[in-house]
Amino acid sequence: RDFIAKEVTPVYHEWETEGHPPRKFYNRLGDLGILGIQAPEEYGGGGESSLKFNVVVTEETAAAGVTFGSYSVHSNLILPYIMQHATDEQKQRWIPGFASGDLMFAIAMTEPGTGSDLANISTTAKLSDDGSHYVVNGSKTFITGGALADRILLVCRTSPFDPENRRGGLSMLVV
């Protein structure tokens, strides 16, 4: 509560005008241990497995009539994907910065014409001829956290659409 009262509420109107908090705000959340509370300690996080701390943040910000910008998507949506699907090398590369606020993530799922119906997305990613990278083609809207993102978790189709298995061929890439 003190943090919100002293460091968020007085400048919140500026964030609203700008459309997002300043980048240094996320570093401050990292300093306080809020941003990476569920990241494993071995990667610089708080090591908490419970969502209770995230619920406290949600309740306190709601009571003050403010938000922490893309904090919720960064911490509650993207981190679990990284923890479940990233390689150990990727976790070592991304999670320390994720927890400190030095590396901000956004998520790109929604597309014009399909909304968040992921089974019908048309954004594609094809492996380059030399196999070193993917070439992405398509459109996304409502990229939550995109204004300050260093990395974007992108949902795309890496195999052709199959009407018998509409979700087949969907992948998540970090770009």
Residue ranges and their predicted role:
Residues R1-S72, E89-R93, G97-S100, M104:
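Amphipathic, small/basic residue-rich leader segments at the start of a protein or domain
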Residues E42-G44, M109-T114, T141-F142:
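Short, solvent-exposed loop/turn elements at beta->coil junctions and helix N-caps
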Residues G69-E89, G115, L127-D130:
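N-terminal glycine-rich flavin-associated loop
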Residues L79-H85, I107-A108, A119, F161-D162:
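Flexible, glycine-rich active-site loops centered on histidine and acidic residues
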Residues W94-P96, G113, S122-T124, K140-T144, ...:
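A generic local secondary-structure boundary/capping motif
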Residues G101-M109, V155:
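A short, Trp-centered hydrophobic/proline-enriched beta-strand micro-motif
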Residues D117-N137:
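Cytochrome P450 C-terminal beta-domain/meander region
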Residues S132-V175:
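A short core secondary-structure module
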